[in-house]
Amino acid sequence: MAGRGKTLGSGVAKKSTSRSSKAGLQFPVGRIARFLKNGKYATRVGAGAPVYLAAVLEYLAAEVLELAGNAARDNKKTRIVPRHIQLAVRNDEELSKLLGDVTIANGGVMPNIHSLLLPKKAGASKPSADED
């Protein structure tokens, strides 16, 4: 009865591959799928939804980490701290809009001095000699 699709003597089990590796992602697709199911966001969750969400989250994390790494390098540091993440997010227009209401702990504030508080230029505010 070997002709009915059954293989004889082949007891080698196929190694399972994760959905993250199938999609080429680092973020856990299975865990995100579990969160979507247990979170009661919908009664049913499609097979592609957790893969897509994992890809979006991975992209956002990579984008923030790249910009924060650049901010750390600009400050001559080798370790990314929350201040670097704050500078990276607030200097990027799209990320700042996305995370506008988010407070980053130990992030500090953006350096900003109002133009009225800056000292006057010496050459620009000189009175002219013609006025007597």
Swiss-Prot record:
Keywords: Chromosome, DNA-binding, Nucleosome core, Nucleus. GO terms for cellular component: cytosol; nucleosome; nucleus. The keyword Nucleus applies. GO terms for molecular function: DNA binding; protein heterodimerization activity; structural constituent of chromatin. SMART domains: H2A. The nucleosome is a histone octamer containing two molecules each of H2A, H2B, H3 and H4 assembled in one H3-H4 heterotetramer and two H2A-H2B heterodimers. The octamer wraps approximately 147 bp of DNA. This is Probable histone H2A.2. Signal peptide: none annotated. Belongs to the histone H2A family. CDD domains: HFD_H2A (cd00074). It is found in: Nucleus; Chromosome. SUPFAM superfamilies: Histone-fold. Expressed mainly in non-dividing tissues of the plant. Also found in meristems and dividing cells. The keyword Endoplasmic reticulum does not apply. Its main location: nucleus. Core component of nucleosome. Nucleosomes wrap and compact DNA into chromatin, limiting DNA accessibility to the cellular machineries which require DNA as a template. Histones thereby play a central role in transcription regulation, DNA repair, DNA replication and chromosomal stability. DNA accessibility is regulated via a complex set of post-translational modifications of histones, also called histone code, and nucleosome remodeling. It comes from the Eukaryota. Not ubiquitinated.
